[in-house]
Amino acid sequence: MFASGHTTPRLGIDLAGGTSITLRAVPEAGQESAINKTNMDTAVEIMNRRVNGLGVSEAEVQTQGDRNIIVYIPKGTNSKEARQQVGTTAKLYFRPVLATELSGANATGTPSASETGGASDKATDKATDKATDKATDGDKATDGDKASGTPSDSASASATSQGRAASDALKADPSPSATSSDGASPSPSASASGDDATAKLQQQYAALDCTDKNARAKAGDGAKPDEQTVACGQNSQGQWQKYILGAAAVDGTEVDEAEAVYNTQTAAGWTVTMKFTDKGSKKFADITGKLAQNQSPQNQFAIVLDNEVVSDPYVSQALTGGNAEISGSFDQEEAQSLANMLSYGALPLTFKEDSVTTVTAALGGEQLKAGLIAGAIGLALVVLYLLFYYRGLSFIAVCSLLVSAGLTYVIMALLGPTIGFALNLPAVCGAIVAIGITADSFIVYFERVRDEIREGRTLRPAVERAWPRARRTILVSDFVSFLAAAVLFIVTVGKVQGFAFTLGLTTLLDVVVVFLFTKPLLTLMARRKFFASGHKWSGLDPKALGAKPPLRRTRRPSRPAAGPVDPKEA
């Protein structure tokens, strides 16, 4: 806990306040009717799953009016990351790359449709059939070109050459095939297409400056999945590149599940692994098989998220495993955020951020203080009862309660940064209720030991013989409590989930403490004279418990065997 730097649990909105984000639904051209109750409810559900996946982060998402959604993020949460999670539409497409080059001030003066720059990546179909996106430098890009075929000639550094390269790329088949490679390769003698759409896209590509934030936001705006488009992306060196992309070959709805994992085998750091549906797997295998036969950069496919290229791996062979992996300069939070967006799906509407404000605590520190005081009073009453009834045994019970409380505090503090757990007032109530559950386990064990002593056994045998019976009772009792907490967690939403989560967590900790601390400690104390001799303040005095005297068996004298009787003399 101290090594991680998280020494206190995160508090929920009701206790510490947080941030309020107001999002406004914006209809696309000709789709004003898309803003309806069904789509708004779907958006709320997806946003809630993104920021509150386990239901314990205390984030709240609710509608306001016909087209506004308000998201409440508790204090201590990365508000910038949360804003990206809830506002990102997360429309994912896999598109073939037709042309790419460095953009704006990052350009080196040698743009061409065959230039891979610093964002050229490699997708290899290894044991797991993962398409691995590794941002590489120029040398590695060259090596990749050699691995996939003979590199094509680069066009000269001039506006005319740039236009020709882009024009030739647009002539390429959007769904590359084995024969499209030669036609797609840039040639100085190639002429611009006369098609209006092609010319317009060529102009957009030539004018696109990806170093401009506004230009990046508008790149590919309004393009349909089955149309060619332009887009921007950033490579591992932080340089912006612009792309001409073909029609989408696979879309995000074909992603069955996504997960953030730390790749230790290839030293790629945090990556996002995706598993496609059966239909998506077939599409992915088809497109990668076609791309593998092309020359760079048309052997690359771009993973496009909300019109921005997040990865552009190149392919050396068809990937048939139905899995893909996105890697790059991700940290854990970024990888988890992307995995959540891919897993929970795209928003049905586009949202614009209207306002971000700081909200105060709904209840404040006084309620938290009152809850802690109530917990302290409950704990004190339990301790007094133990002292009165169990006397010396209360030392073991109090030590066990302190260990359980310490473990609960540490785990709550660590769960904040790991799963976003936030402590609200219902969760505090769950921790208070857990005091009774923990004390109940001690009482069951102590009473079993006392029963054995009443039967006339000494303390050490009584401790060992009582444990199997007490263990079964404790496990059954804790299982029922945990089952109730699990059902409550599943069927409820909002703050009640915090109560159920805390109750279930402390129930599991009760089992750990009883098995690994209470029982070994009682076994150790049974060897001490104070307890073993049955001192009157030990709580295990045989006389006070009404113990039966130990049973003693006496041997009856054996009777002589019957034999012939000598006759008496007269």
Curated annotation (Swiss-Prot):
It comes from Streptomyces coelicolor (strain ATCC BAA-471 / A3(2) / M145). Belongs to the SecD/SecF family. SecD subfamily. Residues 122-146 have a biased composition (Basic and acidic residues). Gene3D superfamilies: 3.30.1360.200, 3.30.70.3220, Multidrug efflux transporter AcrB transmembrane domain. One of its GO terms (cellular component) is plasma membrane. PANTHER family: PROTEIN TRANSLOCASE SUBUNIT SECD (PTHR30081:SF1), PROTEIN-EXPORT MEMBRANE PROTEIN SEC (PTHR30081). Residues 147-161, 172-196 have a biased composition (Low complexity). Keywords: Cell membrane, Membrane, Protein transport, Translocation, Transmembrane, Transmembrane helix, Transport. Residues 104-198, 540-570 are annotated as: Disordered. This is Protein translocase subunit SecD. The chain crosses the membrane at residues 370-390, 395-415, 419-439, 474-494, 498-518. NCBIfam families: 2A0604s01, secD. InterPro entries: SecD, SecD/SecF_arch_bac, SecD/SecF_CS, SecD_1st, SecD_SecF_C, SecD_SecF_C_bact, SecDF_P1_head. It is found in: Cell membrane. Part of the Sec protein translocase complex. Interacts with the SecYEG preprotein conducting channel. SecDF uses the proton motive force (PMF) to complete protein translocation after the ATP-dependent function of SecA. The keyword Cell membrane applies. It comes from the Bacteria. It is a multi-pass membrane protein. Forms a complex with SecF. Part of the essential Sec protein translocation apparatus which comprises SecA, SecYEG and auxiliary proteins SecDF. Other proteins may also be involved.
